C-alpha cells in the first residue's frame, strides 16, 4: 500500500512552526508527518518561526503530541551533508543523535544526503573513502536502534546514478536504503523515472516534488537540489514524471510512503494532495511479481 506523508519543511519559507504543520496534516487527513531536526538550539525554532524540532526536545512528549493529533513520524530529516570531512566532524554525530531520537518516538527511518557542493581540495575518490567510513559509524547505530538510514538524491554525488549506486553498495546492510527525490533528480538534469527503474529494489521512501517552468528554466542542469517547490504537485513540468513513478510503484506493488514537498499554503497543499490521491486511486494492472516492502 502506498500512503502519503508531508515534510514540515514546507513551512520554512513561510516562517511557520512545527505546530502549524501538524495542524495542516490534520486538516488534510494525513496520518504521517516528516520533519527536520536541529542539533542543539536554534533561536528561530525557539521563537516559533521554524518547523524543525530540536534534538534536545523530550522525544516521549513529542511522540505523545503526535499521537494526540492522530499522527506518526514517517521520517526524520537529518540532512546535514555526510560527504567528506565536514560529514566526519559534524554529520556523523548529527545522524547518530537523529537515530536515537527516531527510535524514541517510534519513527522507522532517518534521511541523510550529500552537500550542495563537492568539498574543496579533495578528489572524488578521497570524498567517497571518507563518506564510506562516515556511513560505517552511522550504520552501527542504525543496526542497534533498528532505524533505517536513507540516502537522499540531493547533491552532486547522489544525483549521479553511478555514484549513488556505489554509495548504496558501501555496505550490504538492510539499514542503508534510498530516499528518491523526484524534484532533485529532475533539477539535476536527470530523469526521476529512470532513477526509480534503476533503484527500485533499494527504495524505502520518496520525496515528491514538482517543479515550476520558471525554476526548471533557471536551474535545471545547473543545480542538484531544491528544498521544496512553489509549484503544486501535478501542475509543474515534473508532473508527468511523478505520474509515471507512481504507476511504476503500483505495478511493482511497492509498499511505502510518498512525502509531499511543496509550499505549505492551504491552496498549494490542497491541490497537491488532491492530485496525488487521484493518481494513487487510478486503476492499474499489477505486474506479476512480489511486492517491494519498505
Where are these regions (language model features)?
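N-terminal small/glycine-rich loop or linker at the start of catalytic domains
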Residues: 1-8, 72-81, 114-118, 224
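Histidine-acidic metal/acid-base catalytic patches
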Residues: 1-32, 67-69, 158-294
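The substrate-binding groove and active-site-proximal loops of carbohydrate-active enzymes
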Residues: 10, 49-53, 80-89, 231-236
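Short, solvent-exposed loop/turn segments at secondary-structure boundaries
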Residues: 17, 46-51, 85-90, 121-126, ...
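Active-site acidic/histidine proton-transfer and metal-coordination neighborhood
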Residues: 20-24, 59-68, 72-73, 82-178, ...
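Conserved beta-strand positions in the central sheet of alpha/beta enzyme cores
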Residues: 34, 75-77, 111, 150, ...
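Glycine-rich, proline-tolerant flexible connector loops at the mouths of alpha/beta enzymes
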Residues: 34-61, 115-122
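Active-site loop/turn elements of alpha/beta-hydrolase fold enzymes
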Residues: 35-40, 78, 112-115, 154, ...
Amino acid at each position: 500500500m502506498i500512503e502519503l506523508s508531508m515534510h514540515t519543511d514546507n513551512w520554512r519559507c513561510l516562517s511557520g512552526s512545527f505546530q502549524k504543520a501538524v495542524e495542516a496534516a490534520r486538516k488534510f487527513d494525513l496520518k504521517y508527518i516528516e520533519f527536520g531536526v536541529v542539533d542543539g538550539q536554534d533561536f528561530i525554532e525557539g521563537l516559533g518561526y521554524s518547523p524543525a524540532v530540536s534534538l534536545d526536545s523530550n522525544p516521549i512528549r513529542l511522540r505523545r503530541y503526535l499521537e494526540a493529533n492522530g499522527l506518526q513520524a514517517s521520517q526524520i530529516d537529518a540532512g546535514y551533508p555526510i560527504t567528506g570531512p565536514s560529514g566526519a566532524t559534524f554529520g556523523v554525530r548529527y545522524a547518530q543523535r537523529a537515530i536515537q531520537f527516531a527510535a524514541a518516538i517510534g519513527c522507522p527511518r532517518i534521511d541523510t544526503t550529500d552537500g550542495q557542493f563537492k568539498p574543496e581540495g579533495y578528489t572524488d575518490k578521497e570524498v567517497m573513502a571518507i563518506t564510506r567510513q562516515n556511513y560505517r559509524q552511522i550504520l552501527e547505530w542504525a543496526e542497534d536502534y533498528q532505524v533505517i538510514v536513507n540516502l537522499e538524491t540531493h547533491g552532486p554525488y547522489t544525483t549521479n546514478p553511478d555514484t549513488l549506486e556505489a554509495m548504496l553498495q558501501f555496505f550490504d546492510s538492510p539499514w542503508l536504503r534510498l530516499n528518491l527525490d523526484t524534484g532533485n533528480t529532475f533539477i539535476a538534469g536527470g530523469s526521476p523515472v529512470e532513477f526509480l527503474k534503476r533503484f527500485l529494489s533499494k527504495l524505502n521512501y520518496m520525496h515528491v516534488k514538482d517543479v515550476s517552468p520558471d525554476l526548471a528554466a533557471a536551474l535545471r542542469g545547473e543545480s542538484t537540489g531544491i528544498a521544496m517547490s512553489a509549484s503544486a504537485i501535478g501542475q509543474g513540468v515534473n508532473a508527468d514524471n511523478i505520474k509515471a513513478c507512481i504507476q511504476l510503484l503500483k505495478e511493482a506493488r511497492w509498499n511505502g510512503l510518498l512525502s509531499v514537498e511543496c509550499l505549505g499554503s492551504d491552496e498549494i497543499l490542497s491541490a497537491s494532495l488532491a492530485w496525488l490521491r487521484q493518481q494513487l486511486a487510478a486503476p492499474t494492472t499489477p505486474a506479476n511479481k512480489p511486492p517491494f516492502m519498505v
